[in-house]
């Protein structure tokens, strides 16, 4: 053990001391200088919303107290340039190494790659670690060496691999590096500006409902595993009450490691399998599948880093989204005239939270009923959700809009009234968030437009006055969606585009990453994060697997397996990026974040298309 090394630990979305690879490695080698750097300018269009910033502030305060108890202070820095702040820390502390844990979103990938390059150029050792995932995105490929584009195939491959089972305990003591705070422009947590005075009254409601911080995450996980997990599958069909794990914001900010969550649930699954407890097994499997969806969201963002801007399926660039600001405003404000949708959007605005099922329903309504651009909805979720997570948001909205190979069928249009009867049969959720409908009989509460005038009058409901009329009726919405799909197909035919092609990233103008020989990259290790390469695949249009050919034959005979398969298919012929396994400065880069506790986000089954 080298006890003379001075290391800067750069905290980001890994605000914990347990099972934190970067912190553990630095503490093992010598003295540490923990730092959190807040650079609003670098967040760009993905500057966190009010609720997310509130959580970050509370979590940082919790982490700061924990580090102080171990003997080291957390230095907070607000800056206009991250690399400049890190270089200032190096200059003042005399540190010779910088460590941090990986992120996987496009914004972070670019930033972290730049940071590593600049530090390596100055002779500073840089090491990054996997502190967020079970498997790194560059570890999971199909037998052809290409990224999976279907969740089922991806997750099956993951479950066939081993998982690191050793949990890293928190350091028992940290050796601090003393540095003059004023020399590096350190600030207080209030001076970070994560919360302004106008936001504090609204945030007070969050304080009563949530307890951010890594130690609180541990308590919540233990309670969920021991008391609620067994009923997780049964409760997933309810939108009222405490039917989810509520772990999503803790996972987003890295207050608990996904490895710890996975292992706890997996242990219960093994016990229930031994005891032949089928209900428990089903619940554990559903919860673990949610963890897999969170993993998959990072995987997609890493291997297809354009997905926050473009649909993964190339033909959907022709889809005629309706950029109607008035409809978007009505959707945001919960004034669509569809009670379940409106209740969900009002809950989101009031609390920064929605049940995963409600997230699916309101997002589906936005893109299928109103034909609003899915990127608008994704950005609004990012701005308002307490557990806003860009990678999960991207996966969720692309899935719902039919923009990924195993997403919802493009022509799928779910009736909110029927979904309300299924997931809120007594209307409890509606009455909680739409008090103007509280007196309406349960028979009509999910479709008040069908209620007799006498019933509406007796319930104090006047459609168009104190509650909105439907913004669009179902038949009209179905007709408009069909026309949009028809226009999309016509545009495809005009340019000869295949309906199953994966979008090629628009990086033609960029040169390929510089590849160095291993001997020329002394600061790079096998643990370091890699970045997508500009090297492209070659190939021809995908040959359909046998079962897909059979499916197509059945469709031609009038047999539609729409419930089992997506109408979209992936294409291995497309130009996509892969991760270079060679040692390079580029391989030292870092990562990029809403359906949030993916274990609590998209619960629908994904299809079987994609790289096998």
Swiss-Prot record:
Phenotype of gene-disrupted mutants: Plants show increased root elongation in blue light. Reduced attenuating effect of high fluence rates of blue light in the cry1 cry2 double mutant. Slow rate of curvature at low fluence rates of blue light in cry1 cry2. The double mutant cry1 cry2 exhibits a reduced impact of near-null magnetic field on flowering in lower blue light intensity and short days. Little detectable phenotype on circadian clock in blue light (BL).
Impact after mutating residue 337 to E: Loss of activity
Listed result of changing residue 603 to A: Impaired regulation of hypocotyl growth in blue light. Phosphorylated by CK1 proteins CK1.3 and CK1.4. Reduced phosphorylation by CK1 proteins CK1.3 and CK1.4
Residues bearing PTM Phosphoserine: 587, 598-599, 605
Biotechnology: The rapid blue light-mediated reversible interaction between CRY2 and BHLH63/CIB1 is used to design an optogenetic control of target proteins or organelles.
Alphabetical list of InterPro entries matching this protein: Crypto/Photolyase_FAD-like_sf (IPR036134), Crypto/Photolyase_N_sf (IPR036155), Cryptochr/Photolyase_FAD-bd (IPR005101), Cryptochrome/DNA_photolyase_1 (IPR002081), Cryptochrome_pln (IPR014134), DNA_photolyase_1_CS_C (IPR018394), DNA_photolyase_N (IPR006050), Rossmann-like_a/b/a_fold (IPR014729)
Effect of substituting residue 580 to A: Reduced blue light-mediated phosphorylation and impaired blue light-dependent proteolysis and hypocotyl inhibition response
Effect annotated for changing residue 511 to E: In strain: cv. Chi-1, cv. Co-1, cv. Kon, cv. PHW-1 and cv. Sha
A GO MF term: ATP binding
GO cellular component, one term: nuclear body
Reported function: Photoreceptor that mediates primarily blue light inhibition of hypocotyl elongation and photoperiodic control of floral initiation, and regulates other light responses, including circadian rhythms, tropic growth, stomata opening, guard cell development, root development, bacterial and viral pathogen responses, abiotic stress responses, cell cycles, programmed cell death, apical dominance, fruit and ovule development, seed dormancy, and magnetoreception. Confers resistance to turnip crinkle virus (TCV) by preventing COP1-mediated proteasome-mediated degradation of RPP8/HRT, thus promoting its stability in light. Exposure to darkness or blue-light induces degradation of CRY2, and in turn of RPP8/HRT, resulting in susceptibility to TCV.
Domain text: The NC80 domain (486-565) contains a major active site responsible for the signal transduction processes regulating both hypocotyl inhibition and floral promotion. The C-terminal tail (564-612) is not required for physiological activity of the protein.
Protein name stated in the entry: Cryptochrome-2
Organism listed in the record: Arabidopsis thaliana (Mouse-ear cress)
Phylogenetic lineage: Eukaryota, Viridiplantae, Streptophyta, Embryophyta, Tracheophyta
Gene label: CRY2
